[in-house]
């Protein structure tokens, strides 16, 4: 029986994390170390600090991580990607190009005879009003459409400038 792995909140690309490339390499090295032992990997949100996927443009970077996800799925390892509050704007790039299974909602599933409730967790509990407003804004299709109308060159400045 192969193992199932759960990871979350890597926040790849975060300005708050010094040596971001080193962090990505460590994550990739870990995934490489489990690739022959894993039947599935569940990425439970916020793997990226910010991921906004335009129709024809995805954020630059993360090459090693995305390549490793592709390698895992090519080997037959199921990779499940749950959107978190930092990467909810994930479209179909990760599924089409890397073969990952995207989950936008919580999932109850059975793994080796045990039932698991899997979610990122940002919406669990009793959030305050500010959080509810922010969550509504992030999930608003109207606001996403408006943001998508901004050229990626300019919109990326909103989340990459200090």
Regions found by a protein language model. Name each.
Residues 6, 115-119, 125-126:
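Short hydrophobic-aromatic micro-motifs
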Residues 17, 25-28, 121-153:
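Binuclear metal-dependent hydrolase catalytic cores centered on His/Asp/Glu-rich metal-binding motifs
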Residues 159-162:
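Conserved small/polar residues in nucleotide/adenosyl-binding loops
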